[in-house]
Regions:
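A glycine/serine/threonine-rich, flexible loop-to-helix segment
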Residues: 48, 145, 220-228, 289
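Residue-level signature of the cytosolic catalytic core of signaling kinases
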Residues: 41, 50, 216-220, 278, ...
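N-terminal Rossmann-like NAD(P)+-binding domain of SDR-like oxidoreductases, especially those catalyzing
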Residues: 1-213, 263, 282, 346, ...
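C-terminal substrate-binding subdomain of Rossmann-fold SDR/epimerase-dehydratase oxidoreductases
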Residues: 4, 17, 30, 59-62, ...
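Short, well-ordered secondary-structure micro-motifs
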Residues: 43, 142, 218, 250, ...
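The catalytic Tyr-centered alpha-helix of NAD(P)H-dependent dehydrogenases
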Residues: 175, 179-186, 216, 220, ...
Length: 377
């Protein structure tokens, strides 16, 4: 495979995948396809924009005719599909946008790929459609051990000081879908379409479901960059409910490595879970962020705990996500490489060192959105 489209490549996870592929595979032609919505930012890729094997194309994935023409013109061999609306709060306010982009956009890509690849003499040989999804499609897990227990698995990236599970259950590749938000419902639907194109037409597809990502270049509507910025400026930290909800955290560069491995070596028609083996309650993550930001800014560590502000909980807020990546670990040899404390330190330092990037994003419409989300809670 030489001609690869990466959709959503100007976004958070997508930009890390684009950078990895452009730098690692100079013999590939990498096309970054992105609509450049509020979360798409070409500044994320300034360091590679002049590379000879990189091209950016501004396009809406729902534009079937334009994407089909691109498939023909560039003779596309592989698609890594990351483009999606992904913020749960926004999906609650505007589910139609999520259905359009995540469901119809994915269907548009699938149909264009099908028509182009089936027109070739070799048809699907050497082709691949890789769809990146979320663990939220599985629903929620129970919090049977709110104080934490020893988890059944460990990796070199597991936290040195905080290695706990908050229940015996985990999401597996065989877990039944049970989405609870418009966002997760739209992603579940897109997952089903991808699998249906394999089962019906024989398209070589792969689906992966990942846990919460963190790292550089994440749009500050998500917890970690939002709170790093607020702590820096000593603005209130709006914590849903009591902050007891649990998420599994995966450093974005580890996720990009997994995508690379699965794209090249994963089995067609398989599903792989990609997790960080790091369960944390939201309130505990926030305390780690406060301590880290305070220390790196030369403040007394923990002195900004007083800006934690508990607000009305999110509608349908799932209690716990925890993902089991054992299949990926055993079959392809992947596991996260960065210990959580190291990843958080690296992440916080990046945002503090790149305030101009943050300022450019948090001006204008962002302030209006932020007030709508949190001002009256």
């Amino acid at each position: 495979m030489k001609n690869i489209v990466i959709t959503g490549g100007a976004g958070f996870i997508g930009s890390h995948v684009v950078r990895l592929f452009v730098n690692k595979y100079p013999e590939y032609n990498i096309i970054n396809l992105d609509k450049l919505t509020y979360a798409g930012n070409l500044a994320n890729l300034k360091d590679i924009e002049g590379k000879p094997n990189y091209k950016f194309v501004k396009m809406d994935i729902c534009d079937f005719e334009a994407f089909y023409a691109l498939m023909q013109k560039e003779q596309i061999d592989g698609i890594i599909h990351l483009a999606a609306e992904s913020h749960v709060d926004r999906s609650i306010k505007d589910p139609f946008t999520f259905a359009r982009t995540n469901v119809m956009g994915t269907l548009s890509l699938l149909q264009a790929a099908k028509l182009y690849w089936e027109s070739l003499p070799e048809k699907y040989e050497g082709k691949r459609f890789y769809h990146i999804s979320t663990d939220e499609v599985y629903g929620a897990l129970s919090m049977t051990h709110p104080e934490g227990i020893e988890p059944p698995f460990t990796t070199k990236a597991s936290s040195s000081s905080h290695h706990e599970a908050y229940g015996e259950d985990f999401f597996y590749e065989t877990t039944k879908y049970n989405p609870h938000s418009p966002y997760s419902a739209s992603k579940a639907s897109s997952d089903h379409f991808v699998r249906a194109f394999h089962d019906t037409y024989g398209m070589p597809t792969i689906v992966t479901n990942c846990s919460n990502n963190y790292g550089p270049y994440q749009f500050p509507e998500k917890l970690i960059p939002l709170f790093i910025n607020n702590i820096r400026h000593r603005k209130p930290l709006p914590v849903y409910g009591k902050g007891e909800n649990v998420r599994d955290w995966l450093f974005v560069e580890d996720h990009a490595r997994a995508i690379d491995l699965i794209f090249h070596e994963g089995k067609v028609a398989e599903t792989y879970n990609i997790g960080g083996f790091n369960e944390w309650k939201n309130i505990d993550i926030i305390k780690v962020l406060i301590n880290t930001v305070d220390r790196l800014l030369g403040r007394k560590e923990g002195e900004d705990m007083n800006i934690i502000t508990f607000v009305t909980d999110r509608l349908g807020h799932d209690a716990r996500y925890a993902i089991d990546s054992t299949k990926l670990q055993k079959e392809l040899g992947w596991e996260p490489s960065l210990q959580f404390e190291e990843g958080i330190e690296k992440t916080v330092k990046w945002y503090l060192d790149n305030q101009e990037w943050m300022d450019n994003i948090t001006s204008g419409d962002y302030e209006k959105y932020y007030d709508e989300m949190y001002k009256d809670r």
